[in-house]
Amino acid sequence: MSHHDPKEALITPGAALSQLNERSRDIFRQIVENYLATGEPVGSRNISRMISVPLSPASVRNVMADLEQLGLIYAPHTSAGRLPTELGLRFFVDALMQVGDLTEDERQSIQAQLAAIGKQQSIEATLSDAMMRLSGLTRAAAVVLTGKSNPRLKHIEFVRLEPEQALVVLVSEDGQIENRVLALPPGVPSSALIEASNFLNSRIRGRTLSEVRGELEAALAQRRSELDQLTQKIIAAGVASWSGGSSDERRLIVRGHANLLEDLHAMEDLERVRLLFDDLETKKGVADLLGLAEQGEGVRIFIGSENKLFSLSGSSTITAPYRDSSGRIVGVLGVIGPTRLNYARVIPMVDYAARIVSQMLGK
């Protein structure tokens, strides 16, 4: 997409709308809808046949000149036709587009696909499967930034794997199970592992790790005489194994890359998608963008270079936050595709998918 015209930065969708009469809006809508449907520029002759009020190609050209002056459309060098600029797309999405509700069939399809996801799997696997299905429904790449995991804890256990290695198993109240492998000091008896488990279980139940971490450290300091040194070391190591781990760790899951390869029109499209693949592969900026999206309520739309965080000129991102059982925003999901996404269809799909995922995580 072009964003070369300095005027583009100076005009808001509201200001553009006030400068367009019904005829100009109709012509502009045809240019955008043709682009969303085909990816191709459209010329005045074709537009004069498409619009509701008949106009000569010459009159259409005059209106197109005005739209170009406003920075809403541009002429790609290869063609006499016109395409919307990024500003034009933003104007269309904000001011002209009718976002339809999903049909009952579409709702049921999303619900059925997401309901088919295994109940027994981890939250991460659930989200990964949900994104695979969302990418299939939207024909774009689907992304999810998993929530900061800080669940209320139910049980902790140390299981010996080898003489100097144990598995720390942490079970949360919402059924998540986290495992960490822990190096043990030489000569640790099994009784020390049991004592460490008992010490922690008497303090963590029903609370988050961040709530109890300071208290555990204080309790360890006070009870040094009662607990032998090996047990103290195991407890400290067990707590530390989580402090840099799941409580702050966020995963970015990307599914459906192949959808971005469909419908490529030219070498420049291929180059744009190659750059996008690189970004998705290295996760560069994607997590930052989704983190930004998480700060707002509802669906957010980033078109082309509005997204300053990674080289996505020519691509759009549509996101919505999802919530845990207490209604707290814990992550964000969405789709990334070409700027010619079917916005009217994809926006309600992303919104609905976020609601269904929230329901699934809330159970």
Curated annotation (Swiss-Prot):
Keywords, sorted A to Z: Repressor, Stress response, Transcription, Transcription regulation
Q: Please list the GO terms describing molecular function.
A: DNA binding
A biological process (GO) of this protein is: negative regulation of DNA-templated transcription
Q: Which family does it belong to?
A: Belongs to the HrcA family.
User: What does the UniProt function comment say about this protein?
Assistant: Negative regulator of class I heat shock genes (grpE-dnaK-dnaJ and groELS operons). Prevents heat-shock induction of these operons.
Q: What is this protein called?
A: Heat-inducible transcription repressor HrcA
